[in-house]
């Protein structure tokens, strides 16, 4: 009888704004950090931290670390600044997801976890009556 290997799963949290992209890998419970890479670690210019290219390079670095740890399957949680800020993820989110898939990691589910205000503070630069 062939033995079945237990698949190791991880969670990849992608925080993407227009200024930076932070990719953070944890175990399946979310309690233990495996690796954390940001756009600022892979580029020299501050203006390029939020670019799709920097996000792609960061994702490839993270995928390398995950494979060393034996994690082949991941769930992805995408987050934008949210709250009273931008509700849409920055340009690096899609590039990072594509790079993780290209690196050979199997993606289970992709989830949007952007915080949504339930009538919280007034957004800045909003018209007041």
Curated annotation (Swiss-Prot):
Annotated protein name in UniProt: Small ribosomal subunit protein uS11
Coiled coil: none
Keywords: Ribonucleoprotein, Ribosomal protein, RNA-binding, rRNA-binding
Protein's UniProt keywords contain Coiled coil: no
Gene name linked to the record: rps11
Task performed by this protein: Located on the platform of the 30S subunit.
PROSITE patterns in UniProt: RIBOSOMAL_S11 (PS00054)
Gene Ontology, cellular component aspect: cytosolic small ribosomal subunit
A Gene Ontology BP annotation from the UniProt entry: translation
Species annotation: Methanocaldococcus jannaschii (strain ATCC 43067 / DSM 2661 / JAL-1 / JCM 10045 / NBRC 100440)
Subunit structure: Part of the 30S ribosomal subunit.
Family (UniProt): Belongs to the universal ribosomal protein uS11 family.
GO molecular function list: rRNA binding; structural constituent of ribosome
């Amino acid at each position: 009888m062939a033995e079945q290997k237990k698949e190791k799963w991880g969670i990849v949290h992608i925080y993407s704004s227009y200024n930076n992209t932070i990719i953070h890998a944890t175990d399946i419970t979310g309690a233990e950090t495996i690796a954390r890479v940001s756009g600022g670690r892979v580029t020299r210019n501050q203006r390029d931290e939020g670019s799709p290219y920097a996000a792609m390079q960061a994702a490839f670095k993270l995928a390398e670390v995950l494979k060393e740890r034996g994690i082949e399957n991941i769930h992805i949680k995408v987050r934008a600044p949210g709250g009273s800020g931008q509700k849409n993820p920055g340009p690096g989110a899609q590039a990072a997801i594509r790079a993780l898939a290209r690196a050979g990691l199997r993606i289970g589910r992709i989830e949007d976890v952007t915080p949504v205000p339930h009538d919280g503070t007034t957004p800045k630069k909003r018209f007041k009556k």
